[in-house]
Amino acid sequence: MKNMIKSMLSFFVFLKFKNIWNIKDYLVKNNLDKGIVATVYDYYIHKEGGYVGITSKFANHPYMPHGFMGVFISDMSEIGKNAVIFQQVTIGADRLLDSNNQGNPKIGDNVYIGAGAKIIGNVKIGNNCRIGANAVVVNDVADNAVVAGKPG
């Protein structure tokens, strides 16, 4: 019964807002983290197997060819215009107390992030960058750069 109610609520919320990004924009604009719309947002994101923090910031809606499948974007992360984000990507905060890299990623415009890539901590990814599949990024990346592999 509970799932049926959530499904009905989701249907009506999506009728009003048209897509998940409009729901997120509404929640942020109105400083809401509770209520029916927030519940539907959380339900949809988790149902798709991902997480997009409500306080994460997007210059426009990113293109996700495989949907939210395994995508994790932490709260307070920032993503520029025309981002392409593939499945199983982590854009995550570093909150370890003894870390030199505490903070949230800031990603520039026109950035392509390949499947399984991990961007962790207080790093800045420049504009027009390509982050390869399964790359691990823990340092800043200059504009127009290509990153592949894992730090040594």
Give the location of each predicted region.
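Terminal amphipathic alpha-helical/low-complexity segments used for targeting or macromolecular assembly
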Residues: M1-G50, G152
